[in-house]
Curated annotation (Swiss-Prot):
Residues 33-61 are annotated as: NMP. It comes from the Archaea. The keyword Nucleus does not apply. InterPro entries: Adenyl_kin_sub, Adenylat/UMP-CMP_kin, Adenylat_kinase_CS, P-loop_NTPase. Catalyzes the reversible transfer of the terminal phosphate group between ATP and AMP. Plays an important role in cellular energy homeostasis and in adenine nucleotide metabolism. It catalyses: AMP + ATP = 2 ADP. Consists of three domains, a large central CORE domain and two small peripheral domains, NMPbind and LID, which undergo movements during catalysis. The LID domain closes over the site of phosphoryl transfer upon ATP binding. Assembling and dissambling the active center during each catalytic cycle provides an effective means to prevent ATP hydrolysis. This is Adenylate kinase. The gene is adk1. Residues 1-21 are annotated as: Disordered. Disulfide bonds: none annotated.
Length: 206
């Protein structure tokens, strides 16, 4: 049996990274993120230029370039979990043209919970380690005292990021829901409970 092809949707802070790692460990598939794929293939020639040209200019990499890069990663993978793609409806339609996925799972988390999760993050500037004020603070008092909040984790910036996600990705969610493919997972449960539900959805689809 071929390895599963899994699409994991969810807002920033929904827990996609944690659950993607669980999927990789359990099913032995590749973890494909847009950012990693672009960085790994930044010099890949496409009809519209290389990712590097846009990244170095501080511009968003256009959809046709992102699509080609992600397709290359999918073609090389024996099963995958896609995390952070598709980000908009045109990418979702492109993905449907190039491959079939077994599971489309949405980690469903409310706005207030997302804001709490993201604004509570703290970073150790010396190590880059990430902590959280509510459920993951370091034991070492010296480390606790030097923790900082990153600029992109302030409440204003978090809400802006979530607004952008809603605007771009809600049509993607609607697209898969209309196709009858979307499985909603309660992302506000504990990470272990989320994983139990997600694994059950994957196993049910295979």
């Amino acid at each position: 049996m071929s390895q599963p092809k899994i699409l994991l949707l969810g807002a920033p802070g929904a827990g996609k990274g944690t659950q993607s790692s669980n999927i990789v460990d359990e099913y032995g598939v590749d973890h494909i993120t847009t950012g990693d794929a672009l960085r790994a293939n930044k010099d890949m020639e496409t009809e519209h230029g290389t990712p590097r040209e846009f990244m170095e200019a501080g511009e968003l990499v256009p959809d046709p370039v992102v699509n080609e890069i992600v397709q290359a990663a999918i073609d090389e993978a024996d099963g995958f979990v896609l995390d952070g793609y598709p980000r908009n409806l045109s990418q979702a339609e492109y993905l449907s043209d190039i491959t079939d996925v077994d599971v489309v799972a949405l980690l469903d988390v409310g706005r207030d919970e997302l804001v709490d999760r993201l604004t509570g993050r703290r970073m150790d500037p010396e190590t880059g380690d990430i902590y959280h004020t509510e459920f993951n603070m370091p034991d070492d008092e010296e480390v606790r005292e030097r923790l900082v909040q990153r600029d992109d984790d302030t409440e204003e910036t978090v809400n802006e990021r979530l607004d952008v996600f809603d605007e771009n990705t809600q049509p993607v969610i609607d697209y898969y829901e209309d196709e009858g493919e979307l499985v909603r997972i309660d992302g506000e449960a504990s990470p272990d409970e989320v994983w139990d539900d997600l694994q059950a959805a994957i196993d049910d689809a295979l």
